[in-house]
């Protein structure tokens, strides 16, 4: 049993996934320690990413002072969850993640997970793609990575016995500077509020997946 599994309160995938609901009002008396928040982030970061670039960056907002600053770039209808959540984990996309691309894949090689031939193939194929990519490509690519890790963090929070809600009701121009990050490097993606629900969450329905699915002929 891995150390990550030992951290989980709920290891029932069906319950974690299908009984997950968005919570917007949390018990303000519940505090999640930073060690546990860091564990949850590490567990979420096992999510897949394009070319294993892991183009995400997490900013944890968990003090009254940090929340006051954070709210300067948040739409007012999201204030209740920001104020009541134990923590908000904001996920920003890193458009310069490829700068350490060689380091990432050299580590994979050094760990014995790929051959030298495969390493050379990866670096020769994918690194030039990112080095010559347009800014829009890098933003879209990082946003996809962040969306995947964000969904995983929602599930990890549930597995730790907490509730969560993903939100993007923010000022996209102000958020990155508000977080103290470089706007030339990072793009805002989403915030995830984590805590214990103070009330029964709204149970929503889903469209019939058949109406949203096509099979290419």
From Swiss-Prot:
GO terms for biological process: fatty acid metabolic process; response to toxic substance. SUPFAM superfamilies: FMN-dependent nitroreductase-like. It comes from Lactiplantibacillus plantarum. 10-oxooctadecanoate binds at residues 51, 118. It is an enzyme of class 1 (oxidoreductase). Homodimer. This is CLA biosynthesis enone reductase. It holds the Pfam family Nitroreductase. It catalyses: 10-oxo-(11E)-octadecenoate + NADH + H(+) = 10-oxooctadecanoate + NAD(+). GO terms for molecular function: nucleotide binding; oxidoreductase activity. Pathway: Lipid metabolism; fatty acid metabolism. Changing residue 51 to A: 38% of wild-type catalytic activity. Its EC number is 1.3.1.-. Changing residue 101 to F: 5% of wild-type catalytic activity. Is involved in a saturation metabolic pathway of polyunsaturated fatty acids, that detoxifies unsaturated fatty acids and generates hydroxy fatty acids, oxo fatty acids, conjugated fatty acids such as conjugated linoleic acids (CLAs), and partially saturated trans-fatty acids as intermediates. CLA-ER catalyzes the saturation of the carbon-carbon double bond in 10-oxo-(11E)-octadecenoate to produce 10-oxooctadecanoate, during linoleate metabolism. Changing residue 51 to S: Almost no change in catalytic activity. Its cofactor is FMN. FMN binds at residues 20, 22, 24, 78, 81, 165, 168-169, 206. Keywords: Detoxification, Flavoprotein, FMN, NAD, Nucleotide-binding, Oxidoreductase. Belongs to the nitroreductase family. The gene is cla-er.
């Amino acid at each position: 049993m891995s150390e990550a599994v030992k951290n989980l309160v709920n290891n029932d995938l069906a319950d974690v996934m299908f009984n997950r609901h968005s919570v917007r009002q949390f018990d303000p008396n519940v505090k999640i320690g930073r060690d546990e928040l860091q564990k949850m982030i590490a567990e979420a970061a096992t999510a897949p990413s394009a070319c294993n670039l892991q183009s995400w960056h997490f900013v944890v907002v968990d003090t009254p002072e940090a929340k006051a600053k954070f709210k300067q770039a948040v739409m007012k209808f999201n204030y209740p969850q920001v104020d009541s959540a134990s923590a908000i984990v904001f996920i920003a996309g890193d458009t310069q993640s490829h700068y350490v691309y060689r380091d990432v894949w050299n580590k994979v090689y050094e760990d014995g997970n790929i051959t030298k031939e495969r390493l050379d193939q990866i670096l020769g194929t994918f690194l030039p793609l990112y080095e010559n990519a347009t800014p829009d490509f890098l933003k879209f690519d990082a946003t996809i990575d962040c969306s995947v890790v964000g969904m995983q963090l929602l599930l990890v929070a549930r597995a730790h016995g907490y509730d969560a809600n993903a939100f993007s009701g923010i000022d996209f121009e102000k958020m990155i500077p508000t977080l103290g990050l470089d706007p030339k490097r990072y793009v805002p993606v989403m915030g995830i509020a984590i805590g214990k629900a103070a009330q029964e969450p709204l149970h929503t329905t889903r469209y019939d997946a058949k109406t949203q699915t096509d099979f290419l002929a």
